[in-house]
């Protein structure tokens, strides 16, 4: 299970401004996903078709915590699989810090997203801090096709894992 510090980090970088939180009702409501498709709720949970109706009624903090834990387990399993099949590395042999770095990438990008960062993944597996620092930054393409840095997430990632 990831550390509390990592879970707090993930909550902050996924939705630190608490988009979709209704203070009066003490419920979370869906909001549009930047990548399109089904809406997202709380901490980056992409709603499945079967979840939409219930989510539109609002979810409690406990319910979104459960979704976060499920999504973290899914990201962890995905990171383990990609590390084994594409990098010939054993996830369980890595330090907790290294595991959490890879889980963060899998949570944010999907487990296959790790394949897009082979130098970073290799550096994590070899505890090569210099290469990690050179390769950790993530970007997105805006609606006009321009590549933009995920600045806040990158800064928080550096602060937690690499500083």
Q: Whereabouts are the PLM-identified features?
A:
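Alpha-helical segment that forms one wall of the substrate-binding/catalytic cleft
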Residues: 54-87, 96-101, 108-114
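Substrate-binding/active-site groove segments that recognize
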Residues: 28-56, 68, 72, 76
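Amphipathic alpha-helical segments that form the core helices of the histone-fold
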Residues: 35, 41, 99-106, 122-125
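Surface-exposed patches in mature extracellular/periplasmic domains of secreted proteins
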Residues: 19-25, 81-95, 119, 135
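A contiguous strand-loop segment
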Residues: 12, 16-19, 23, 69-70, ...
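Extracellular/periplasmic catalytic domains that process cell-envelope and extracellular macromolecules
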Residues: 1-2, 32-35, 94-97
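Short, functionally critical alpha-helical segments immediately adjacent to catalytic or ligand/cofactor-binding
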Residues: 5-18, 101-105
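Long, amphipathic alpha-helical surface segments
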Residues: 1, 5-8, 16, 45, ...
